[in-house]
């Protein structure tokens, strides 16, 4: 459950800080899938209705694809999320992003 583990924005990898800034400014995002609905099928994040969570790619240097790093944010309006979570292992674990 992502409720306990946190990570400060300043402690995210630089690519994560960049993605977080893009989320708050509403893009533009480099990947087509950025901003798509995240289903929370793993049920590691607090349970919410479908469409509440959206996922964004955190670039991984030298990865040939989108890599395993993501930021998932929840809320009514994508650029003013209620909460965002960072995963470095493709949704196996999450840490809540704090200021």
Regions found by a protein language model. Give the residues of each.
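N-terminal secretory signal peptides
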Residues: 1-44
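Functional cores of ribonucleases/endoribonucleases
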Residues: 27-99
């Amino acid at each position: 459950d992502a409720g306990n583990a946190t990570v400060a924005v300043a402690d995210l990898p630089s690519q994560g800080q960049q993605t977080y800034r893009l989320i708050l400014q509403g893009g533009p995002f480099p990947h087509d899938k950025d901003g798509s609905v995240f289903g929370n099928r793993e049920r590691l994040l607090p349970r919410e209705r479908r469409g509440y969570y959206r996922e964004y790619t955190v670039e991984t240097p030298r990865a040939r694809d989108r890599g395993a790093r993501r930021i998932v944010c929840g809320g009514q309006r994508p650029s003013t999320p209620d909460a965002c979570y960072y995963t470095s292992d493709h949704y196996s674990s999450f840490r809540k992003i704090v200021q």
